[in-house]
């Protein structure tokens, strides 16, 4: 008799092959049998007729580094079928750290990932100094899913150089570089899944300074990359603007050429064409190089409860901004208040003077004025701001934009924003497309998902608490791209499932999960596909000290199974916590990815890439929006 048998489900097994109807037997933590019909009974059985049965989602771009200290369920990701989460992304994290310097790492995390510093101060125990000690501390806790960690460039540079020198982007000395490389190797030998770095000007601490490593030299990056290689396993994760693609590519090329370890980077637009082509070429040649692509536009949520809305610098709003939401809403319902607010202009001078007077301010007036101007532009780009419906549509049409609604109603864009955000007792949200949204279509994502090397990534679960809510991305990847999309091409379920299971798992050497096959971990989702949806995001105050965060519920998850145990049924947690800390590469008898690409297919794709690279060399301006599709 088996521990658990799932019967009659439509199995989308994570391999990318066509779905099939069958049964799955589970014993202990693993899948013991997959068959058209299993004769033996189970101690517990689930009838999955009419339902999808998939591997549990493997989300490789999260920021639950602090939340693991107080939330064993890692919500909202666990509500969306995630059974494995990788954190330590973007070069931020909480180890290593010298006693007394914890606040610096909190300031980095708060600035980069918009996680309230007060919650981090209250919720983290800090019973570690080194990265191996950090892993030991996490391993003592219980979780609903498996957790993997990378060592981040920010804490690493701070630990070796001191936070004053590391933050000012000074070059590390040769001895400091060697020490950092040694600590990367030490971390991976202790169980870290890799090393992460941030090379984007968007990532800053709470005072506006670039995070450590943003402008680190090629020599430093090369040494840290080969710190991964020296350990013999692990993956290098980069978040980059690719502002100087040639310089960034120089050390990456050497790493990929000489190392058999992994490389992954978050890609949110199509500008880094050369890097994308480089990734596809070397993946087809057998290297573990994986660009991550979000399945929807990175979207900011503007509302009266969120961290941003277009009225934040208006005098009338500033007078009530400190009030609890219910009191604020009662005031804003008054027509006189609305008229007063809409008649005003933002008072930037007061905010600029306030910033200049701050003790820790290091910016000039000109820099602060520029930041204020950018913020105004961000909140008033009405052509790419949309009313977020229920269920939300993450590929909205032009007519859904604030600009179009304003024109249709004959009122100002600001009045449209105010009226929409006041709905549902002032909790309604406006969706602002932050990354490029050309022609009101997710064409870039469509092209990216056609790449063999691409994986689903960028949910940022646990981060951007008051402004972004993309931890639900694994759910919308299926509901939108396989079922609901109207703006263009859809993808078959088997392709989408693989992108966020087998492919993401193998990016970090987790070969024991991501497929429904005998011997694999029994991490499984049972899904009512017709009911699969995400809710309208909502604000809750459940972080330590009452900190706020946006969350998003899901419908359609009949059950989520982790290591053979049912952790969620019909959206409710069962209370079982079978998740483990992942220490390093995990093995199982699985064929390599490259064997899945036929010789003919690989040859044709490589030929396309070579042509594309030549075309890019001589026609850079013409190629940016079209070249990726030539490889799909």
Spell out what each predicted region is.
Residues 70, 96-101, 204-208, 244-256, ...:
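Histidine/acidic-residue-rich catalytic or RNA/ligand-binding cores of hydrolases
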Residues 369-371, 443, 447-454, 459-460, ...:
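C-terminal cap of metal-dependent C-N hydrolases
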Residues 70-186, 190-194, 619:
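Divalent-metal coordination cores built from histidine and acidic residues
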Residues 229, 284-288, 297, 301-322, ...:
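His/Asp/Glu-enriched, well-ordered alpha-helical/loop segment
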Residues 259-360:
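Polar, glycine-rich mid-to-C-terminal structural blocks
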Residues 58-60, 85-87, 147-151, 195-197, ...:
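Hydrophobic faces of well-ordered beta-strands that scaffold small-molecule active sites
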Residues 1-5, 10-56, 537:
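Histidine-rich, glycine-flanked metal-binding segment
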